[in-house]
UniProtKB/Swiss-Prot annotation:
The gene is ARP5. It is found in: Nucleus. Keywords: Isopeptide bond, Nucleus, Phosphoprotein, Transcription, Transcription regulation, Ubl conjugation. This is Actin-related protein 5. It comes from Saccharomyces cerevisiae (strain ATCC 204508 / S288c) (Baker's yeast). One of its GO terms (cellular component) is Ino80 complex. SMART domains: ACTIN. There is a cross-link at K12 (Glycyl lysine isopeptide (Lys-Gly) (interchain with G-Cter in ubiquitin)). The lineage of its organism: Eukaryota, Fungi, Dikarya, Ascomycota, Saccharomycotina.
C-alpha cells in the first residue's frame, strides 16, 4: 500500500445480520377491559397485521402477517407460531409463510389461523362466535373472489354481527380529514403496490385512481437483484430480511436524481454517501506463535530460499553452457560454409536438420539472442561467487589436457567435473565481458541522449513521448489479450484453438522430419521465434509459454518506468497524472469506486471479501416509484400520474387549475409503510412545484409513522356513529343479498367502474 493510501481513514463497516430474535411472546390483552360492543379494526396488510379496538389511539397488536407450523422431533408434537411468535426461534422464523401471494390472499387456512390468534390476543370472549363488529382493509379495486372469501370467514366461521370493508389509503385520508367531506389527493406507498387516488368531498374517485405495480416488497427484491449482479461471487447468501434492513436503513429518495446520479461516484461524494455493509461470518483465527517459533520459521525459509537459489543458479549455468557450445558449433558451421557452393551448403544444412539456409540463419539468430539474454542474467549474480569458484577451480583443471586412456575411472569422473566447472567459468567470464560491453554502450547512449536533449529539447521530448505511448499501447493490448485468453468463450480464445489445431495438423503432415530436441533447452531449435518482432505477437496469441510472456511484460514495464522518469525530470508538461501507474490508480477507476468505494481494496482481507458497498443503489432503488421503467414496469411514475390527475382532470385547463384541483394540491397525503423512505415528501413537493402553475400553494402531509394511518382512519370512522353505520354490512344483509353484495360508501370500492 502506498503512503498516499495509508493515510486514508478506513470506512466503517456495518454488519448486517438478520433482525434479533424476540425474547418474549406476543402479550395478551386483559379480558377484564373487554367490551363486546366495541368494533375491532384490522389492517390486514401483506407485510404487517395491525389490530386493536377502536377505542384505543393506536393498534395494540402489530406483528408480521406470517405463520409457521413447526414440528418438534424431540417432543413429537406440532406447534403453530403466528406473528411475532415466529421470531422467537431462528428455525421457526426461517419456515414462516404468508397467506399472501403478491397482493392477493391465497391461503385462507392460514388466514383463519392468524385471525384466531389475533382475536385470542385481543382478549375477545367468544359468544357463539365473535360478538364485535369488524373493520377490515382491502386493496384498491380488489377482485370479487377476495371479498367473497372474507364474507364467508367472517360471517360463517366467526359469526360476526357486521363488517366494514374499505380501501386502506382512503381510511388513511379519513384519519386526516375526519369530517368526511374534504377534497385531496392520496399517494399510498404500500408493500405490494403504489396508488394515486383523487378524493372529492371525502369520496375516492376510483375511476381516476391509478396503481403502480411496485411496492416495498418489489423494492427489496430489486435491491437483492442489483447486489447479486454487482457481486456475483459474494461468499455468502444474504437473506430477504438482511436486504430489507439495508433498504430501510440506507436507501433514500434523491431530491434530484439525474444530478445526483452523475456525481455519486466521485471521491468527494463517496466519502460521505458510500455505505459499507458486511455479511456476518465466522473468522478463523490462526494460533499465535512465539518469537522463538517465528525466528526458527524465518531461518528455515531463509535456508530454503538459499538452497532453491543455488539450484536455480546451477540449472541456469547448465543451460548457459549448453547454449554456448551449441552457438559456437553452429557459428563454425556458418564460417566453414561461407565460400562453399550453394548445393553443398544446402546438403550440409539439410543433414543437420534445417530446411534451407534461411531457416539456418533464423535459428542461429534466435539462439544468439537467447544466449545474450542468459549471459545478462548470469552476470547479475554476486561477483564473490565468481571469485570463490575461480579460487577453488584454478588448480583443478590439470586433468583436462590428459587423454581418457591415461586416466582411471575416478580420474575420468573428476575430469568431467573439471570440464563443467571450466565451461562455467568461461561462460561467466563471457557474461562479464558482455555486461561490460553493454554498460559501455549504455554510457555512450546516455551521452548521446544528453547532447540531443541539450541541443533539441522539444524534439527529444516528442521522441520520448512517442516511444512511451507505443509501449503503453502495446502493453495494454497484451494485457487485454491475456485476459481474453482466460475466457474460453471469447473470440480470441476460439481463434487460438483453431490456430493450435492448424499447427497440429501441419506437424502431422511434416512428420518427424526434424528431430533436434537435444540442441537447445528453451524450445525446439527450429522454432525461430524472436527473429522478428511480429513473432512475439504470434507467441502471445498461442501462449505456449506464459512465463516468458510475463517476463516480457516486466521488461516492457521497466522501459516504461524509465521513460516516465526521464520525462518527469525534463518535460515540464509531464506530471505524475500522466504516468502509467496513475492510469491504473483505483481513484481513476469508476468500476473500483462503484464496487469498492473510496478506499483501496485488499482482496486478501477476509472482512473486505464479505463486504458490499451501497452507493448508486441507495437512490436507484427508491427512484423506481418515480420512474417505474427502471424496475421493468411499463407504467408512469407517481408524479406523472399526479400531473395527469391535477392538470387534465376535474375541469383543469393548461396553465389554470380548477378549484377541485387546487383543493387537491392543498391537501396531498402520503401514506403507507413504503412512504417511510427518507426524502419522499421533499421530492414530491419539488416535482409538484415543477409541473404546477407558478405560485400554486402546495400542502403535503405525512405522519411520523404512515404505516398506522389506515388503522387510525378505521378507528376514527368507527367513532363517528353516523358515518360508520352507513358502511356496515350486517350478517342479515349478507344472508339476504349473498357474497357478491357490496355496500358502497365514500371509503370503499364500488361494484362497477363507470366511464
Amino acid at each position: 500500500m502506498s503512503s498516499r493510501d495509508a493515510s486514508l481513514t478506513p470506512l466503517k463497516a456495518v454488519v448486517i445480520d438478520d433482525p434479533p430474535l424476540r425474547q418474549t411472546p406476543e402479550p395478551f390483552d386483559e379480558q377484564s377491559a373487554y367490551n363486546p360492543q366495541s368494533p375491532i379494526a384490522i389492517d390486514f396488510g401483506s407485510s404487517k397485521l395491525r389490530a386493536g379496538f377502536v377505542n384505543h389511539a393506536t393498534p395494540t397488536h402489530i406483528f408480521p402477517n406470517a405463520l409457521t407450523k413447526f414440528r418438534d422431533r424431540k417432543l413429537n408434537k406440532n406447534f403453530t407460531f403466528v406473528g411475532n411468535d415466529t421470531l422467537l426461534d431462528q428455525a421457526v422464523r426461517s419456515q414462516s409463510r404468508s397467506p399472501f401471494d403478491g397482493p392477493f390472499v391465497t391461503n385462507w387456512n392460514l388466514t383463519e389461523e392468524i385471525l384466531d390468534y389475533t382475536f385470542h390476543h385481543l382478549g375477545v370472549v367468544p359468544d357463539n362466535g365473535i360478538p364485535n363488529p369488524i373493520l377490515l382493509t382491502e386493496r384498491l379495486a380488489t377482485v370479487q373472489s377476495q371479498r367473497t372469501n372474507w364474507y364467508q370467514i367472517l360471517f360463517e366461521t366467526y359469526n360476526v354481527p357486521g363488517v366494514t370493508f374499505g380501501i386502506d389509503s382512503l381510511f388513511s385520508f379519513y384519519n386526516y380529514n375526519p369530517s368526511g367531506n374534504k377534497t385531496g389527493l392520496v399517494i399510498s406507498c404500500g408493500h405490494e403496490d403504489t396508488n394515486v387516488i383523487p378524493v372529492v368531498d371525502g369520496a375516492g374517485i376510483l375511476t381516476d385512481a391509478k396503481r403502480i405495480n411496485w411496492g416495498g416488497h418489489q423494492a427489496v427484491d430489486y435491491l437483492n437483484d442489483l447486489m447479486a449482479l454487482k457481486y456475483p461471487y459474494f461468499p455468502t447468501k444474504m437473506s430477504y430480511l438482511q436486504y430489507e434492513t439495508m433498504y430501510k436503513d440506507y436507501c433514500y429518495v434523491s431530491r434530484n436524481y439525474d444530478e445526483d446520479i452523475e456525481k455519486i461516484l466521485t471521491l468527494e461524494n463517496l466519502d460521505t454517501n458510500d455505505v459499507v455493509v458486511e455479511a456476518p461470518f465466522t473468522e478463523v483465527l490462526q494460533p499465535q506463535k512465539t518469537e522463538e517459533e517465528l525466528r526458527i520459521q524465518a531461518e528455515k525459509r531463509k535456508e530454503t530460499g538459499k538452497r532453491l537459489q543455488e539450484q536455480a543458479r546451477l540449472k541456469r549455468m547448465e543451460k548457459l553452457v549448453q547454449k554456448q557450445e551449441e552457438f559456437e558449433y553452429f557459428s563454425k558451421v556458418r564460417d566453414q560454409l561461407i565460400d562453399e557452393p550453394k548445393k553443398k551448403v544446402l546438403s550440409v544444412l539439410q543433414n543437420a536438420g534445417f530446411d534451407d539456409e534461411r531457416d539456418f540463419k533464423k535459428y542461429l539468430h534466435s539462439l544468439e539472442q537467447s544466449l545474450k539474454k542468459a549471459q545478462m542474467v548470469e552476470a547479475e549474480d554476486d561477483s564473490h561467487l565468481d571469485e570463490m569458484n575461480e579460487d577453488k577451480t584454478a588448480q583443478k583443471f590439470d586433468l583436462l589436457d590428459i587423454a581418457d586412456e591415461d586416466l582411471n575411472e575416478d580420474q575420468i569422473k573428476e575430469k568431467r567435473k573439471q570440464r563443467f566447472l571450466k565451461a562455467s567459468q568461461d561462460a561467466r567470464q563471457k557474461a562479464k565481458e558482455e555486461k561490460e560491453r553493454v554498460a559501455k554502450e549504455e554510457e555512450e547512449k546516455k551521452l548521446k541522449e544528453q547532447q540531443w536533449r541539450e541541443t533539441d529539447l522539444n524534439g527529444w521530448i516528442k521522441d520520448k513521448r512517442l516511444k512511451l505511448n507505443k509501449l503503453i499501447k502495446r502493453r495494454k493490448e497484451k494485457l487485454k489479450l491475456r485476459d481474453e485468453m482466460k475466457d474460453r468463450k471469447s473470440q480470441v480464445s476460439q481463434n487460438r484453438m483453431k490456430n493450435l489445431a492448424s499447427l497440429a495438423e501441419d506437424n502431422v503432415k511434416q512428420g518427424a522430419k526434424r528431430n533436434r530436441h537435444q540442441a537447445t533447452i528453451d524450445n525446439d531449435p527450429n522454432d525461430t521465434f524472436g527473429a522478428n518482432d511480429e513473432d512475439w505477437l504470434i507467441y502471445t496469441d498461442i501462449t505456449q509459454n506464459p512465463e516468458a510472456f510475463e517476463e516480457a511484460l516486466e521488461y516492457e514495464y521497466k522501459d516504461i518506468v524509465e521513460l516516465e522518469r526521464l520525462l518527469l525530470e525534463h518535460d515540464p508538461n509531464f506530471t505524475e497524472e500522466d504516468t502509467l501507474e496513475a492510469q491504473y490508480d483505483w481513484r481513476n477507476s469508476i468500476l473500483h469506486l462503484f464496487l469498492r468505494g473510496p478506499r483501496p481494496h485488499d482482496s486478501e482481507n477476509i472482512h473486505e471479501q464479505h463486504q458490499m458497498h451501497l452507493n448508486v443503489e441507495r437512490i436507484r432503488v427508491p427512484e423506481v416509484i418515480f420512474q417505474p421503467t427502471m424496475g421493468g414496469q411499463d407504467q408512469a411514475g407517481i408524479c406523472e400520474l399526479s400531473e395527469t390527475i391535477l392538470l387534465k382532470k376535474f375541469g383543469s385547463q393548461p396553465g389554470k387549475l380548477s378549484q377541485t384541483s387546487i383543493d387537491m394540491v392543498n391537501n396531498v397525503l402520503i401514506t403507507g409503510g413504503n412512504a417511510k423512505v427518507p426524502g419522499l415528501k421533499e421530492r414530491i413537493v419539488k416535482e409538484f412545484t415543477g409541473f404546477l402553475p407558478t405560485g400554486t400553494n402546495i400542502t403535503v402531509n405525512m405522519s411520523s409513522d404512515p404505516s398506522l394511518d389506515a388503522w387510525k382512519g378505521m378507528a376514527a370512522l368507527a367513532r363517528n356513529e353516523e358515518q360508520y353505520r352507513k358502511t356496515v354490512i350486517s350478517k342479515k344483509e349478507y344472508e339476504e343479498y349473498g357474497p357478491e353484495y357490496i355496500k358502497e360508501h365514500k371509503l370503499g370500492n364500488t361494484k362497477y367502474f363507470e366511464d
